[in-house]
């Protein structure tokens, strides 16, 4: 039973698969059939009828005959073949020969694609032929009008073209021959060939129109404008030489010689080769070179004018620097009597003097060359600019040195003022200790006080020495300031601690009669207090009172910090 069911299932699967394959093949056959009908219905004959009004000779006749043959072949050969193959594909599908059916359908696809491509080529060639005829008919009149206009202009202004007149006229004759060839091709039905001829004449006319417009300008530039500019530049150059300008670095004569050679090359390109683009490019380079030379000469004139104004200005500035140097030398000698200058500080003055000496030598050399006119103004201008920068640097160096000298006196005054403040701080600290209830001063603080007093005394002695060494004074003064500040801080802390201990003990006295242990602890704190062991006295008293009255010490400390 199971075997029968299996066979039945297999049969159903095979039947379903065959059905699906046949369905897909029938669908493809229908598509190709529709494509074939579409090709057969294409209006090729109608499209070919569009050229009936053209001259049916030459290329037109050849095209028409070929198109008709190709269309007849499609209709009478390709399409019947396709119809036959469609029946074959359907028959193979009915007999379950699916592989063979697919091969036939692929062959049909290729035949229809080839026919479609052939038809598209025919339609494009028809459109090109019709379009060429229409464009030729419109544009030939424009070309003839332009030809007439160009020839009239050439005749009217023939004197402007010189030797080029014959070449341009020969090109115009070529255009006319081209127009006649166009008419012959059109008459012979060769519309596409006529189109090529017409476009060639159109391009040649554009080129000739460019010649008509540009040749007179270029000839004028080569024959008149540029030679005049070169002559003008040469005259200006000679005038500057006569006035004493040194212009060897510009090499104007060599440049002018090169310009004349380039001008000859531009004329040859124009007259011999009728190469307007090359001639125009050469003329442009010549114009730019002339302008560059003018700019260089003008720069030389401007440099000369600037130098004539700058030299007296720098001379006056150098005299001022020299006077400042002498004043500073005198001031240095005066300062050296009262202050000890370091080697580095003295070297700054020597460096400034050497720099000034070098600047004066360089400036004198420039003045000599200027008087003898041995060098171009533009080169001297650069040297003067360098000298001016050096003078500015020397002035800054001098100002820094002067500021340093003045700073020494200012530092001395500041040191004396700070020393006065430190001495007063020591006195105030001692007075504060005397006024307080401190039973005695710990040895560590006493030693710091002695050190600060000794250091302050040494600073005082250094300030009274001549010459004064401010570096040593400032170093010792900084040490004294640190010691005095430390003494004042520790003294203030000591006074505050003593007052706090007294308050804690006084507060604890109210519990002495009630607490024997507290009484003994306070007694111990008092002993430490009068033995100058203040930290230990505070710890003992604070622990005892805090035990008897929690939070009391914190309240007492807060009250002690409140201003009275």
Swiss-Prot record:
Q: Which GO terms describe its cellular component?
A: plasma membrane; septin ring
Q: Does the keyword Membrane apply?
A: yes
Enumerate the UniProt keywords alphabetically: Cell cycle, Cell division, Cell membrane, Coiled coil, Membrane, Septation, Transmembrane, Transmembrane helix
Q: Which residues form a coiled coil?
A: 99-159, 243-281, 310-498
Q: Name one GO biological process term.
A: septin ring assembly
Compartments where found: Cell membrane
Transmembrane portions of the chain: 3-21
Q: Which SUPFAM superfamilies match?
A: Mannose-6-phosphate receptor binding protein 1 (Tip47), C-terminal domain
Primary site of residence: membrane
List residues in topological domain: Extracellular.
Answer: 1-2
Matches recorded under InterPro entries: EzrA
Record's bilayer topology term? Single-pass membrane protein
One Pfam family from the record = EzrA
Q: Which residues lie on this side of the membrane: Cytoplasmic?
A: 22-564
Q: Which domain of life is it from?
A: Bacteria
Could you tell me which HAMAP family the record lists for this protein? EzrA
- NCBIfam families under this entry? PRK04778.1-7
Q: What family name appears in the similarity comment?
A: Belongs to the EzrA family.
The role this protein plays is: Negative regulator of FtsZ ring formation; modulates the frequency and position of FtsZ ring formation. Inhibits FtsZ ring formation at polar sites. Interacts either with FtsZ or with one of its binding partners to promote depolymerization.
In Swiss-Prot or TrEMBL terms, this protein is called Septation ring formation regulator EzrA
Per the UniProt entry, what species is this protein from, by scientific name? Bacillus licheniformis (strain ATCC 14580 / DSM 13 / JCM 2505 / CCUG 7422 / NBRC 12200 / NCIMB 9375 / NCTC 10341 / NRRL NRS-1264 / Gibson 46)
């Amino acid at each position: 039973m199971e075997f029968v069911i299996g066979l039945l299932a297999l049969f159903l699967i095979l039947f379903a698969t065959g059905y699906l394959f046949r369905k897909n093949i029938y669908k493809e056959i229908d598509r190709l059939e529709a494509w074939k009908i579409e090709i057969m219905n294409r209006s090729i004959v109608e499209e070919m009828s569009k050229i009936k009004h053209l001259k049916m000779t030459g290329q037109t006749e050849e095209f028409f005959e070929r198109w008709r043959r190709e269309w007849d072949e499609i209709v009478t050969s390709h399409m019947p073949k396709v119809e036959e193959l469609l029946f074959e594909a359907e028959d193979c599908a009915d007999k379950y020969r699916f592989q063979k059916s697919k091969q036939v359908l692929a062959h049909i696809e290729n035949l229809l694609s080839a026919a479609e491509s052939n038809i598209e080529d025919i339609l494009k060639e028809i459109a090109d032929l019709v379009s060429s005829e229409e464009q030729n008919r419109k544009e030939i009149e424009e070309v003839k009008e332009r030809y007439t206009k160009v020839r009239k202009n050439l005749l009217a202004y023939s004197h402007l073209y010189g030797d080029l007149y014959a070449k341009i006229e020969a090109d115009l004759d070529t255009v006319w021959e081209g127009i006649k060839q166009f008419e012959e091709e059109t008459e012979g039905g060769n519309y596409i060939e006529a189109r090529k001829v017409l476009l060639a004449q159109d391009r040649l006319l554009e080129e000739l129109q460019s010649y008509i417009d540009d040749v007179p300008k270029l000839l004028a530039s080569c024959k008149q404008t540029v030679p005049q500019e070169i002559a003008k530049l040469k005259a200006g150059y000679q005038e500057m030489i006569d006035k004493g300008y040194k212009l060897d670095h510009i090499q104007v004569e060599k440049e002018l010689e090169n310009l004349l050679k380039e001008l000859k090359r531009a004329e040859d390109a124009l007259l011999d080769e009728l190469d307007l683009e090359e001639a125009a490019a050469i003329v442009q380079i010549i114009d730019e070179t002339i302008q560059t030379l003018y700019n260089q000469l003008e720069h030389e004139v401007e440099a000369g004018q600037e130098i004539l104004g700058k030299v007296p200005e720098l001379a006056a500035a150098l005299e001022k620097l020299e006077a400042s140097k002498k004043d500073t030398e005198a001031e240095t000698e005066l300062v050296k009597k009262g202050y000890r200058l370091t080697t580095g500080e003295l070297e700054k003055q020597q460096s400034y003097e050497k720099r000034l000496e070098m600047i004066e030598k360089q400036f004198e050399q420039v003045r000599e060359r200027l008087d003898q006119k041995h060098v171009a103004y533009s080169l001297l201008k650069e040297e003067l600019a360098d000298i001016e920068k050096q003078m500015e640097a020397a002035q800054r160096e001098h100002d820094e040195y002067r500021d340093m000298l003045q700073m020494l006196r200012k530092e001395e005054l500041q040191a004396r003022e700070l020393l006065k403040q430190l001495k007063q701080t020591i006195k105030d600290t001692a007075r504060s200790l005397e006024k307080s209830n401190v039973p005695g001063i710990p040895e560590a603080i006493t030693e710091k006080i002695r050190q600060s007093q000794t250091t302050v005394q040494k600073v005082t002695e250094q300030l009274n020495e001549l010459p004064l060494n401010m570096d040593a004074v400032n170093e010792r003064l900084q040490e004294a300031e640190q010691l005095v500040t430390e003494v004042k801080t520790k003294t203030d802390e000591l006074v505050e601690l003593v007052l706090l201990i007294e308050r804690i003990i006084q507060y604890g006295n109210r519990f002495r009669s009630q607490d024997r242990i507290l009484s003994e602890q306070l007694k111990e704190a008092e002993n430490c207090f009068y033995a100058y062991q203040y930290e230990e006295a505070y710890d003992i008293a604070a622990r005892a009172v805090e035990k008897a009255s929690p939070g009391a010490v914190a309240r007492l400390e807060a009250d002690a910090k409140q201003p009275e």
